[in-house]
UniProtKB/Swiss-Prot annotation:
Described purpose of this protein according to its UniProt entry: One of the primary rRNA binding proteins, it binds directly to 16S rRNA central domain where it helps coordinate assembly of the platform of the 30S subunit.
Subunit structure comment from the entry: Part of the 30S ribosomal subunit.
Keywords from the UniProt entry: Ribonucleoprotein, Ribosomal protein, RNA-binding, rRNA-binding
Family: Belongs to the universal ribosomal protein uS8 family.
Species for this entry: Methanothermobacter thermautotrophicus (strain ATCC 29096 / DSM 1053 / JCM 10044 / NBRC 100330 / Delta H)
Protein name: Small ribosomal subunit protein uS8
Length: 130
């Protein structure tokens, strides 16, 4: 079976394991994009530690869940956003102002929308977490 969107699959896997109350979650296949999104989620306190395991195929991530995620998902289509347009998408994807994060791919790397606003750069919206 081919995956059309591995990032969407990873976030759905995390959300389903959070709902079930599991402590750990396995994400396959692993990719650099998924690893950077996980690092951003970890930095914001939504997940605990995670590690990459090379299984001889595509690899996988083992993620420790903390129970801090109410909902997460990808943003499709991946909107291109200028530095002053983040508020419109905050209203669309997040339940309240200053609650949750939107993960953005920028020329300076993957970061939250708050960091991108502070640095004054735009990018493409990847996912949301709250």
């Amino acid at each position: 079976m081919t995956l059309m969107d591995p990032l969407a699959n990873a976030l759905t896997n995390i959300r389903n394991n959070e709902i079930r109350g599991n402590v750990k979650c396995r994400i396959t296949p692993a990719s650099k994009l998924i690893g950077r999104v996980l690092r951003t989620m970890q930095k914001e306190g939504y997940i605990g530690e995670f590690e990459y395991v090379d299984d001889g195929r595509a690899g996988k991530f083992i993620v420790e869940l903390e129970g801090n995620i109410n909902h997460c998902g990808v943003i499709k289509p991946r909107h291109a956003v200028k530095k002053d347009e983040f508020e419109k998408f905050e209203k669309r994807y997040l339940p309240a102002k200053n609650f949750g994060i939107i993960i953005v791919s920028t020329p300076e790397g993957i970061m939250t929308h708050k960091e991108a606003k502070d640095r004054g750069i735009g990018g493409r919206l990847l996912a949301y977490v709250y």
